[in-house]
Amino acid sequence: AKVEDELIQRIAACLEKKTQPHLAVVIVGDDPASHVYVGSKVRACERLGIRSTHIELPANATEYEVRQTIESLNKQDGLHGILVQSPLPNHMDEEGLTDLIDPSKDVDGFHPQNLGRLVQGRMDGMLPCTPSGVMRMLSWAGIETEGKTAVVLGRSRIVGMPQSLLLSAKGVDSTVTV
């Protein structure tokens, strides 16, 4: 509830400036879990006053079609965030397609430019959602991290690796074992 209240205030400030936040979600294929997840994102956008565009491409879409979709979204000035839902069909280069997303619109924080900032200890780019959420939960719970040892299970590009970087960043200063 607290996060949602903060978001509502931030969105209201944007709307006062005549800017409605706008998220595009691209889903390729028919993975049931992905469709449920995207549906919840679209409903959350509606609830919060964020405009959302939901783009569905068939499982047999070509990588070129997805590339064209991303490049088109990058060019839209009134669009503030792009999310390409994982997993993509096996015939697609997920990392290559992620690399095409404008880093300033990369809401997942997976673009190499955003991950590179994180490696440098900079928090001025888009940060991966789940690791950022973990850091907020630690803060809300009053758990001090400085000088502590943290264990991160897994090295995934989506959670494990960015989580270890956030925990070892300046100001957090944990010793991390992966």
Regions found by a protein language model. Give the residues of each.
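Acidic/glycine-enriched edge-of-secondary-structure segments
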Residues: A1-D5, R51-N60, D124-L127
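Positively charged, low-complexity intrinsically disordered leader regions
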Residues: A1-T19
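N-terminal glycine-rich anion-binding loops that anchor highly charged ligand groups
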Residues: A13-L23, D30-R47
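Short beta-strand elements in bilobed, periplasmic/extracellular small-molecule ligand-binding domains
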Residues: L23, C45-A59, D173-V178
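Glycine-rich phosphate/diphosphate-binding loop of Rossmann-like nucleotide-binding domains
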Residues: V28-V42, R122-V178
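Non-catalytic terminal and connector segments of soluble metabolic enzymes
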Residues: R47-G49, S72-K75, I101-S104
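Short, well-structured alpha-helical segments in soluble
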Residues: E65-D77
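Anion-binding alpha/beta catalytic cores of soluble intermediary-metabolism enzymes, centered on
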Residues: G81-A150
